[in-house]
C-alpha cells in the first residue's frame, strides 16, 4: 500500500490530528532560500499561516523573516501528541536520536544535496525503523512538485497520499453500528459508556464484532513477544483480513473528501493541543 498515492483533501476531527511537517523556504534572499524547518502541528493550515506571519503571530523564531515558507509534506496518524513530538525531535536531531545515531550517513547533508533532499532522506529512514515502522502513519504530500519516490521501502501499511488537511469540530459518525453488542467479543466484559468511543469493530459492515482496543490488539499480536502494536490479522468472527492501521483510521475520525469541498473554518478552531514545536531549525552545513 505504501507505493499507492491518492489525492484529495482529508477531513480530520479536532483533537485527533497530530502531524509533523516539513517547511521549505521560498525566500528571495539566497541566504535562506531552500532552507528547511521541521515542526509539529495539530492544524496545518493555521500553522503555515503563523510561520509566514512571524513569531509575533505564533510562528517560530527560527522561521521569522526567512520566508515565505511552503509546507511541502506532513506525516500524521500518530496516536497522541507525545508520539508526534518524539518523531519531530528525532527528525530534527538525527545525530542525537537514540534510534538514528547508528546511521552515520544521516548526521550531515551530503555535498550537492539540497536541504529538502537531506530532510527527506532522514524521514525515509525513520519510517522504516522502530518504533515508527509499526505505527499507522500517513505520509501526505502537500505540494505536488516536491513529490518523489522513497529509496528505502516503507512498511506496506504506511500510506502515501497527496492533498490538503482540514480540521473540523464536527463529530464523526459512530464507527460502531447500533446492532453491535455492548460486550467485548474477546474478553466478554461489559463495555462501559466511557469506553464506547474507543471500541473497534470489523472492517466488514455486516460483521457484529465489538472489541476493546487493547483486547483486539492483543488478539492480533498473537505470539509476537515484545511487540505492542499489531500490523494486521484476521477478524475473530468473520475471518476477514484486518489492517490495524485502517482500523485506527476509521476509529480516529478521518474522512476523505473531494478537493473542491468547502474548507471547514479550520483557522477559527481552537485545539486541545497547541502548536508548540521544538523551534529547532536544521543546522545544515553547505
Swiss-Prot record:
Comp. bias regions, Acidic residues: 257-280
Domain GIY-YIG span(s) in chain numbering: 16-102
Class of enzymatic activity (EC top level): hydrolase
GO terms of molecular function: 5'-flap endonuclease activity; crossover junction DNA endonuclease activity; zinc ion binding
Superkingdom field: Eukaryota
PROSITE patterns in UniProt: GIY_YIG (PS50164)
Cellular component GO terms, alphabetical: Slx1-Slx4 complex
Record Gene3D superfamilies: GIY-YIG endonuclease, Zinc/RING finger domain, C3HC4 (zinc finger)
Record localization: Nucleus
Entry EC number(s): 3.1.-.-
Keywords: DNA damage, DNA recombination, DNA repair, Endonuclease, Hydrolase, Metal-binding, Nuclease, Nucleus, Zinc, Zinc-finger
Coarse class of the protein's main subcellular location: nucleus
Cofactor dependency: a divalent metal cation
GO biological process, one term: double-strand break repair via homologous recombination
Region (Disordered): 255-286
SLX1-type zinc finger segments: 184-238
Quaternary structure note: Forms a heterodimer with mus312/SLX4.
Reported function: Catalytic subunit of a heterodimeric structure-specific endonuclease that resolves DNA secondary structures generated during DNA repair and recombination. Has endonuclease activity towards branched DNA substrates, introducing single-strand cuts in duplex DNA close to junctions with ss-DNA.
Family: Belongs to the SLX1 family.
Name of the protein in question: Structure-specific endonuclease subunit SLX1 homolog
Organism from which the protein derives: Drosophila grimshawi (Hawaiian fruit fly)
Lineage: Eukaryota, Metazoa, Ecdysozoa, Arthropoda, Hexapoda
Gene: slx1
